[in-house]
Amino acid sequence: MEKPKIIALYGSPRRKGNTAALLKKAVEGARDTGAAVEEIVLRDLKLSPCLEIYGCLKAGDCAIKDDFQKVRDKILDAQGLMLASPVFFYTVSSHTKILMDRFQSLWVKKYWVDKTPLEKQNNTRKGLFISVGATKGKKLFDGLLLT
């Protein structure tokens, strides 16, 4: 039986912060159960923010050529996704937000172009989101839940 593939995305700008430490523990746990986990540090990638040039309207693919396509393909090929981001101003880090915004192209593909971005996927994917914040506000994580 093939090991399930999981992508672990480190969305913090700090390599050895609390967010990274928690995701590292989750990665260890997944590997202990037999999963093949690939770790990707978003701060190491060349990711442009969405430029709203509407190239995705043509075929559902983002027109900006950078590391997004490689990460997108790995995520689409995986059975699971782990994402970790610290709280920055009541939302995710800029590294994480850029990646999330770029996935708008899949929404366009699904709802505007051909409505089948995940047609080859017949399984249920699993996801885990880890976030850490330093302030004590009662609504500290509300923005992340909405995002």
Q: Which residues does each PLM region occupy?
A:
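N-terminal beta1-alpha1-beta2 submodule of the flavodoxin-like/Rossmannoid cofactor-binding fold
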Residues: M1-V108
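Short, glycine-/small-residue-rich phosphate/pyrophosphate-handling segment
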Residues: K110-T147
